[in-house]
Every structure is written in C-alpha cells, then in structure tokens.
Amino acid sequence: MGIKIVCKNKKAYHEYEILDTYEAGMVLSGPEVKSLRGGRGNLVDGHVAINARGEAMLYNVHISHYMFTSHNPVEPLRVRKLLLHKRELHKLNGKLKEKGLALIPLKIYFIENGKAKIELGLAKGKKMYDKRATLKEQQGKRELARVMRRG
C-alpha cells in the first residue's frame, strides 16, 4: 500500500527556504479523515505555533466538510492539535523564537496503518531576489532538459 499523499503545499518551496523537516500526527474527527481521504485539503496559508501549554497547533489549514456526514459539521478552518514528542516540541519552540523562522505544513499523507500524518518544515522566508534566482535556475534546468531530449 505505501504512503498516499493527500495534499502538498507547493507554494511553500517558492516562498520559503526549508531548513529542516518534521513528521507529526494530527488530531482529527472522523468526517475530517474521510474528507482528507477524498483529497479535500488545502495547506497554502497554514502555519504551526506552539501555545502556552507547550502543544503544537495547526492554524489556517482548510479541510473541507465531508458531504455524506449527517451529524455536527466541523469548522473547515478550525485549529487542530499536532502530536509530536516532547523533546521535538522543546527543540522547535527554541528554534521558533529565533528571528525569521516559521513552522509551515508541507504535505499531508496517510501511512500504511491508515493514520494521517503531516510533514512540517522549519522555514525561513525568501527575499524577492532569492525567488527570482530560484526561478531562473529552474528555467535553466528545463531548457537543458529540453535540449538533451532533442539530442
């Protein structure tokens, strides 16, 4: 079966320089899991913060309402708790206090036993000229690949 990727945050790689990645579990309700299995999630504006109780919380991640549920609908943009080891939380809390670092969601996926996981990236924002340099580099690679294919 392997890993089934539900949604990716492609914009994150353009807007941020990813320094390190972490894997975390998510506390979800039943309809949210079913909605994610259908690929109905959006990570674009999401971010993670550690609250006063030392828990990692996921903000602004949109998981659409599951259309076949009949009981209490869940708020699509609700704050969700993330499950990390205490040691990882302390390490992340120290790094997040550094200037310019943020913790952003990169992708949501399901592992073999059916549990939803989220990959988080410790990121530093890119300047406009860094974004332009990255785009030029990607275009150069595409041109080279195109020339190599033509032979």
From Swiss-Prot:
Its main location: cytoplasm. It is found in: Cytoplasm. GO terms for molecular function: RNA binding. Keywords: Cytoplasm, RNA-binding. The keyword Cytoplasm applies. GO terms for cellular component: cytosol. Pfam families: SmpB. InterPro entries: SmpB, SsrA-bd_prot, SsrA-bd_prot_CS. PROSITE patterns: SSRP. Belongs to the SmpB family. Required for rescue of stalled ribosomes mediated by trans-translation. Binds to transfer-messenger RNA (tmRNA), required for stable association of tmRNA with ribosomes. tmRNA and SmpB together mimic tRNA shape, replacing the anticodon stem-loop with SmpB. tmRNA is encoded by the ssrA gene; the 2 termini fold to resemble tRNA(Ala) and it encodes a 'tag peptide', a short internal open reading frame. During trans-translation Ala-aminoacylated tmRNA acts like a tRNA, entering the A-site of stalled ribosomes, displacing the stalled mRNA. PANTHER family: SSRA-BINDING PROTEIN, TMRNA-BINDING COMPONENT OF TRANS-TRANSLATION TAGGING COMPLEX. NCBIfam families: PRK05422.1 (NF003843), smpB (TIGR00086). This is SsrA-binding protein.
